[in-house]
């Protein structure tokens, strides 16, 4: 693989019991790029996203064939530490899910789990993470208030800060703005542009406009298959596949 490739799947099949949800997915994700996964509901894009940090392991009847590599190491090898994998490949979910703790503790929790105990180090890392998530100025005077008192958009940025605190290399985002208003959505999108300078970002979105605004590369999924992938501008102006064109132009979906 090219040295710029941070993560890739090769011949990936995924099953829920006897049902095959993903068919032969081969896709590369480059360093410091945003890749948008698009496609109609049920097409497999979120299932694929959850394969990238083995969240689907939590489903007893699930099964994976093929491989997914992070820095050319197969994340499904038996010796892989899944907790460490999920530190390296962080995830932000569709609905903000802060812990019922203070703003400070939401960010510090993952650091403590990963062995950080020094108070000064924790404080520095919490501030740094909140700054990276563009939230510090809004919460710096109420760090010990409940995170549940934040607005939806602030809660989502807190969840991003929580993911960033443990220094991931890849950030997965499953429709991170779908539950937010337009102003909060704009802040999340601006944040994605900033974060890609440091991270590889993979985002699932139902919004064609959002995919066009935030991503460098777009991958179109349909009925569990990867139909087309390429430069976002090209995909949205000159798609190479009729199914891609029909979906992007709203003929189905």
UniProtKB/Swiss-Prot annotation:
It holds the Pfam family ABC_tran. GO terms for biological process: phosphate ion transmembrane transport. Residues 7-248 form the ABC transporter domain. It is a peripheral membrane protein. It is found in: Cell inner membrane. CDD domains: ABC_PstB_phosphate_transporter. It catalyses: phosphate(out) + ATP + H2O = ADP + 2 phosphate(in) + H(+). One of its GO terms (cellular component) is plasma membrane. Keywords: ATP-binding, Cell inner membrane, Cell membrane, Membrane, Nucleotide-binding, Phosphate transport, Translocase, Transport. Its main location: membrane. ATP binds at residues 39-46. GO terms for molecular function: ATP binding; ATP hydrolysis activity; ATPase-coupled phosphate ion transmembrane transporter activity. Its EC number is 7.3.2.1. The keyword Cell inner membrane applies. InterPro entries: AAA+_ATPase, ABC_transporter-like_ATP-bd, ABC_transporter-like_CS, P-loop_NTPase, PstB-like. Part of the ABC transporter complex PstSACB involved in phosphate import. Responsible for energy coupling to the transport system. Belongs to the ABC transporter superfamily. Phosphate importer (TC 3.A.1.7) family. The complex is composed of two ATP-binding proteins (PstB), two transmembrane proteins (PstC and PstA) and a solute-binding protein (PstS). This is Phosphate import ATP-binding protein PstB. It comes from Oleidesulfovibrio alaskensis (strain ATCC BAA-1058 / DSM 17464 / G20) (Desulfovibrio alaskensis).
